[in-house]
UniProtKB/Swiss-Prot annotation:
Gene Ontology CC terms, in alphabetical order: cytosolic large ribosomal subunit
SUPFAM superfamilies named among the record's database cross-references: Ribosomal protein L25-like (SSF50715)
Source species: Haemophilus influenzae (strain PittEE)
GO BP, sorted A to Z: translation
Any Pfam family: Ribosomal_L25p
Domain of life: Bacteria
Gene Ontology molecular-function annotations: 5S rRNA binding; structural constituent of ribosome
Organism phylogeny: Bacteria, Pseudomonadati, Pseudomonadota, Gammaproteobacteria, Pasteurellales
Recorded name of the encoding gene: rplY
Name of the molecule in the record: Large ribosomal subunit protein bL25
Subunit structure: Part of the 50S ribosomal subunit; part of the 5S rRNA/L5/L18/L25 subcomplex. Contacts the 5S rRNA. Binds to the 5S rRNA independently of L5 and L18.
CDD domains xref list: Ribosomal_L25_TL5_CTC
Length: 95
């Protein structure tokens, strides 16, 4: 199963900005690795929450569309809420 998500570059950093994103149904994330600089991004929570239910989400290469440019990544780390079925943050590594 191929996964493809639209992402926005995140400019506001910090705890307050991340909380505002989560309250609006979005997830802060980061893309790093390779020769490019790390990029902070914003993703839709519901899309990712549904996709992460599939086992292949963790092993396959995922395509992120960041500012019109496609980036191939793999999930490096995921942080989940302690008792709610919510994602808190995701780290992606360039494939």
């Amino acid at each position: 199963m191929a996964f493809k998500f639209n992402a926005e570059v995140r400019t506001a950093q910090g705890k307050g900005a991340s909380r505002r994103l989560r309250n609006n149904g979005q997830i802060p994330a980061i893309v790093y690795g390779g020769s490019e600089e790390p990029v902070s991004i914003i993703l839709n929570h519901d899309e990712l929450n549904n996709a992460q239910a599939h086992e292949s989400f963790y092993s396959e290469v995922i395509t992120l569309v960041i500012g019109g440019k496609e980036v191939a990544v793999k999930v490096q780390a995921m942080q989940r809420h302690p008792f709610k079925p919510k994602l808190v943050h995701i780290d992606f590594k360039r494939a």
